[in-house]
Amino acid sequence: MPPAIVILALFTAALCAVNLRTVAADGPRIYRNEWALHVEGGTAAADRLASKHGFINKGQIGSLEDHYLFVHRRTWKRSLRSSSHRHALLQREPEVRWLQQQVVKRRVKRRVKRVYSMYPWEQRVQHSSPQVNNPAQQDNLWDPHFNDEKWDKMWYLHCDRPEFACQWSDMNVEAAWKKGYTGKGVVVSILDDGSETDHPDLAGNYDPDASSDINGGTLDPTPRYEYTNENRHGTRCAGEVAAMGNNSFCSVGVAYKASIGGVRMLDGDVTDSVEAASLGLNPQHIMIYSASWGPDDDGKTVDGPANLAQKTFQAGAENGRDKLGSIFVWASGNGGRTHDSCGCDGYTNSIYTISVSSASEQGKVPWYLEPCASTLATTYSSGAPHERKVITTDLRKGCTESHTGTSASAPMAAGILALALEANPMLTWRDMQYIVVMAANPSPLDRDTESAYPRDPRKESDFVTNGAGLRVSHNFGFGLMDAGKMVELAESWRRVPEQHVCEEDPNAQQRAITKGETIVDTKTTGGCNGTDHHVKYLEHVVVEISLDHPCRGHLSIHITSPSGTRSTLLPERQFDSSSDGLKDWAFMTTHCWGEQPEGDWILEVKDLGQQNCQRYGLRTVLPVLRKWKLILYGTAEHPLYKRDEESRPHTPQTREEPTDEEECEDGDYYDRSKQRCRHCHDSCATCHGRHSGQCLSCHEGNYFVEDEGTCSEECGQGYYKDEEERKCLDCSADCLTCQVSADHCTSCDDEDGLKLFENTCVAQCSEGRYMDENDVCQDCDDSCDTCTGPDATDCVTCADEDLLQESQCVESCSSGYFQQEYECLKCHATCASCSGSRDDQCLTCSGHLELDEDTHRCITSCEDGEYGTEEGKCEDCNIICKKCNGSQADQCLECHHDTNLYDTTCVQYCGNRRYPENGECHPCHPSCLGCIGGEINQCNQCITDYEGEDHFLYQGTCHVTCPPGLYGDTTDQVCKACAPGCIACDGPADNQCTLCEEERAPTDGRCQSEGSQTDEAECAEGCHSCEEGPDICDSCDEDYYLTEDTCVRRTNCPSFTYPDDQDRECRPCHDNCEACDGPNNQNCNSCKEGFYKTPDGCSTGCPNRYYKDDTNKECKPCDSSCFTCSGPASFHCLSCADGDFLHESSCRSTCPAGFIGNAESHECVESSCEQDQYYSSETGRCEDCPYNCRACDNDGDCAECAPTYIVVDGRCRPEETCEDGEYQDRDRDTAELSCRPCHQSCKTCSGPSDTDCDSCKGDDTILDRGECITSCGPGEYMDRREKKCKACHPTCKECSDEYDDTCTACNDGFLLTDASSCEAGCPPGQFLHHGDCDSCHRECKTCDGPHHDNCLSCQPGSYLNDQQCSTHCPEGTFEETYEDDSGETVLQCRLCHVNCKTCHGEGEEDCMECANDIKYKQDGRCVTECQEGHYPDLTNECQQCWSDCETCDGPRNDQCVTCPYNYYLVLGKCLEDCPEGYYDTMRQEKECGECHPSCATCNEGGNYNCLSCPYGSKLGEGVCYPMCEEHEYYVEKTQICEECDNSCKTCRGSTAHDCLSCEAPYGYHAMKHLCTACCEEGSPENEYCCICHESTRLCITDREAEGVQFSSADSIPTNVAYIAVATFICVVIVVLFFVVFGMLQARSNGRLCWAHKYQQVPTTRYEKMNDHVNILSQEDFYNEDSLSEDEIHSIDSTRH
């Protein structure tokens, strides 16, 4: 066949293959003949099951323990139908916990496909081999001028256009390089389509342990080469991370000395197991995984990691890098053109990945960018087609200037992370995310951003400030990654507190989604407060949503945090016409980072319905929000309070502010708003603000309360003392108080039903029991799993499969109930049967209501202002509602014009962080505390952020720092004008300037003409310190309070402020207050104009049950019978509380005579009955009132009687008149009234007994609680002026009749002093406990409680140790003796140094044994690792290395780990030159590269750089061609190939000492050419073995048994019989050889009838195509561009 036809046929086949693959990806599922299984019992159990059922076990999947991949050879490798019959039996095996047939997943590389023609600067550049630099130039000092060819064009790493001032041109990478960080020691792996291992710019950094070929099942990640260069993506990404610097070739990687690996996993079928194997490759070695791929960016796909990949992400975070956590970097996506959102990508949406976005060179939004809330940060990449792109390595050892998209951003971010990880290798995966957030720079991107692509409608910056004061964007995350800032933070970073996960119960009430309308649903959370999952400071927020919709692309979904930060979870996607909805899809947002979660989270789901949907009408899908759930990730402790001031990262918005923090002394902090150092609060040793709650550490003797940031001498209730750290730590949630540890309770909370048992708080009854009325635990009913009582059948959960309905366990739900999980819940009142509890989930209706098929509601014909009752009637809404869905005040849907809707109730005042608009309360911008609108420039009051920093109001916007010429007034948080001439100041006075015009420094706070001076003066009255001038106080004397840098008396605090006694400052009142005694609205004493005083503060309107008093400007309470009123009296009611009726502006439980109560209007309406009749609802007619009753209510109870009769219990009784000293009494049997005498001590009384006095006889008696007495009871004294008995002081048991604190006897635990007062105290040997003096433990001399063994001093001969007395000191302490002030000898135990287990002193060098976590001992000190040049021996003593080694792991010369300068490390030895089989890599680090196994000597790696060949091979243009097959060697004399020794894989001779390579599992000894066993743990000392390299299986060093000799003679048998047999076999073989050789010669000469002449095989390269041999020229044969390494191997194998 002609060659042209062959090429055409192959080309057509290739196109068909591509088309078939595309159809398969877009069409139905493709199933592989592979199954992933979770098998208990390990590899042995998996192998047994595979063999039993006809599968092959391919081994463990990545790093997932007990997860295996099975293959079935009798199943189609790729099929459109699943093969469930293959694993039906397998699934029944008890060891199989889970299995799944693997499905091909469509995964695309996130490079940008060209939309314009190729530009010149996009052309790929081919290069010759790199030049070798002079070693003298390979200096450790960083040189800003690299000699790499494209360095000058790498605009994103350095400024290459000085004429433009390079304002936004780089990511501050050079700052990290200047510190000496290059990524050295950090391992990065690129998960992609492979990576060229021998690329000139990558080979020196290539790490085989970070590489694998998952697609091909080998260890070599080299890409598959084909004519389109489709598999160039991974090589390009690798170059961005770790292209070598200063090698005169191509580009420079961000981390140009990092180790780089590649994983080939995209060039084939991608399944869940393929992804898991890639993500879990060697997680203890690889530190950073970079991925620039994901689901289709087509604007319609919703997809993410499946079961195995999700487990691998979590396992990597929990166990990778020795439990520090693997770091996963992901490209956010390139679906901008299709309006895609990375919120629909489960990889970028994961909390375990760092999702990276792109920015153009101009800092603009690229046309391909996908905005979403999960993006963490941004790096530079390509923009519009005419803009410059990223330079990096390319396929076939090339270089490109056209790498694009977020594919370029993710590896660039991975390189920056490698620099930070080199600065601090102990960073956890969460530490790294914090550092990215804190260091990200929004400034280059936070501008009026015009998109770099004309079709993209986004025109403005979308940065907002969240509730923690951080700037964040859906386009760019927290901003541009800043490498210099990241390594600076990493250097001193301390680990963030442990991660807590608060998972709220789902909102499962189904809501119909209506076209053009928005569903708003609120979830209130306390952040799991009071539990072990408490989240106080947020990191990630995940919202899991399930919904149905016929056209998913019509929906937009948002979530708003309690701080007002609004995240777009899902924007409208016009190409998404799917009717699949969302099934528990997890959206994630990072925008609430640092906020506190407590409060209302608002979910908005809107059906925009603007585009036609292709799927409408194809199948019926009702648009319904089924459920949503909130999952909060974060910390219970403040993540920044955990580190010292100098190590604490600062929030990004202050990055560009001038700072002199390093110049502040201990006890001071840097005030950013005033740009100077200020004193901490007196209680703080170090701090980050001036208040008592802003401490970072405490003075000696005090304890630090982390949650509050305060210092205290004692820990309060709910805390215990950590004496070592000097901190107050939280007790367990069950403990009321505790000691020593969080769960060592000393008391319990009785209100929670807990009791103390062996220092643990336990519930009173165990599970399955309840406490009856007699406080006895009883068994629950058999139907209950748990119950509450008072009866055994009051179930909480049910046994077996029963369902809980109204506290009873039933087999199935009754009519009018529906099943939700294991509970029967009541349907809405309008539903007879239902699918949920809402009124729009009815299936059938109750009463006379009718079902609306569209809304699934049961409706009536009620008007606005009415609602339908259960009986199908229309009744009035509550008076405060205009529209409602019930009669209650919290069931409003719309309000009257003078009130606003706040959630579901109507209020006159919306409160903080909200503003009224269109009758509703809307959230302010997150930076506002109060506002007039939702925009950033509509604030009227500013927040104080979570670091305690005030924000200041200027022209409607809240600023961290006021503009020049203004200062931040902390009293009202407003920017106010400085004095004339000041451009910066601390206050309005002319002596408060900090910077003058023309940037002159002020003199004593005043701006004066140059040369003038002011004499120094002492501080003004009341000032304790005044460093900047006598009138600028930094702190005040006692009894003075600081206000605007001035000290005043407490009573002289300015208007609108109040004295804060704790901080001794005049603090601002709430904005609504005119005068106050505290900072909150509730602390107002009087209100500003337009506000009324309420119990909750000052408000523009009054709440229900209150009315406006315009005279006193306050809200006064209505009469208790009124719900709303116009005045204080009972006859001023406007509406009544539940159950009462309004009559003539009064509220009554029953209507008066002649009126009946209207149940709908709750008013009394006139009755048609006569005056002495009432309307009976039972008979439906007018009935007569009782005898002698003139008028009665509708129940027939008398309200008015005839003359001489009175009303008694609703009936008329004869009236009886009583004299003074008598009271009226009613006979219990006859109900007749009579007069009875009062007690003799009473002057008057009112009953019902004779001692119920109203007044007393005589002056020596007083009225006390209705009784006339002459003396008071125990613990009381008589106040004769007020004629009352009053309680004595709490310490007094008895007191005199004059004063409450003039004690005559004391309560237990108190002693009576000479001054007649009672003071706490107990004699020596006792302590005060619950008011009594209890004895100390017999070993204590003195003690202080709360337990008898909390000793303060010990009896003679005992040692005091941590408040305990003992005869000897425990481990970790040493004995010390001293004399106290009284001269007595004191014995105590002192703590050893933290590194010591036992010691004889407190010094580091006084250790006798080392602590458990410290292994080594050097020069008498316990150390975590031996010093350089030393290694630990078997006793863990540090010993000196061999003299040639810099570091080592043993004493011999072949146990070096690193070498001195100018030495090479080869097989554990430090050598001056590279030995045979190795070559000089010419790197700065002086490394020997290993020659290809086919070479004897070489000048570079690879099989085409040989200089000489081993025995049995021939050299041809740098390639060594073996002349024999594997297991054979070439004999020069006979020119034939002979068999190797059985131990060899390849060899140069017949003995065991002639091996060149070995079969597994043997190791190869390169010096002795020997294959031998690798030493294992427990190998006998007399056994010969070698210590092998883990991956190459090369012998690093050997161990010879004593007396064992190895020579060629070892393999020669000495037995004569053996020699005879061997000789006979040799003769037979020789005869057979000549017979066969003769026949072949005859055939080749055509002398046999079946013979054909051989065609001579040329020594040139050939290719076989369809049985036709094409001969190529010698020149083509050695052309590098036309001959790949794989092809050379093909030639070799064919030749052999």
UniProtKB/Swiss-Prot annotation:
Q: What GO annotations for molecular function exist for this entry?
A: serine-type endopeptidase activity
Q: Which InterPro entries does this one have?
A: EGF-like_dom, Furin_repeat, Galactose-bd-like_sf, Growth_fac_rcpt_cys_sf, Kexin/furin, P_dom, Peptidase_S8/S53_dom, Peptidase_S8/S53_dom_sf
Q: For the Peptidase S8 domain, which residue ranges apply?
A: 167-487
Which GO biological-process labels does this protein carry? peptide hormone processing
Q: Which domain of life is it from?
A: Eukaryota
Q: Where is this region: Catalytic?
A: 111-488
Write down the top EC class of this protein.
hydrolase
Glycosylation positions?
Answer: N246, N529, N885
Propeptide, residue positions:
26-110
The annotated region (Disordered) lies at 643-666
Q: Which family does it belong to?
A: Belongs to the peptidase S8 family.
- Record protein name field: Proprotein convertase subtilisin/kexin type 5
Gene that encodes it: PC6
